[in-house]
Amino acid sequence: PTLKDLYNNNLYKLSANGEKYIIPLWHHELVYDNLGHDLYVNCLPDLPDHITIDENNNIHIDVKYNIHDIWEHEYIQVQCDTMCYPIQVNTLKLTHMQTVIFAKQGLSKINAKNIYDVSNKSDVYVTLHLTLQ
């Protein structure tokens, strides 16, 4: 799946041995009973190199900015597919690396009791690397 599929809580219809399964794409791995045998479904999203998703469905975005490029701006916009996470420049510290957290603004959390539940969202962690060049 794509990041857009994950953000939009898209489902995939899978056919296996004449059986049909509706797969929530924001899950990492699901196991279904397929005519007495376990059917393992792994959802491996297609992600850019600077983005990862952890076991709790939190998104981690790693970005690099030159201090000179952002100094005169009020915000920097960190893109994650179609989502945009604005960071106020005047809240940043002059350190090489820092993390800004966008609580409950990420993907749907995995609910093992109800795999289609999309009511709780994960967090987004933006790790900024500031440089002088």
For every predicted segment, state its role:
Residues 5-133:
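Intrinsically disordered, low-complexity linker/assembly segments
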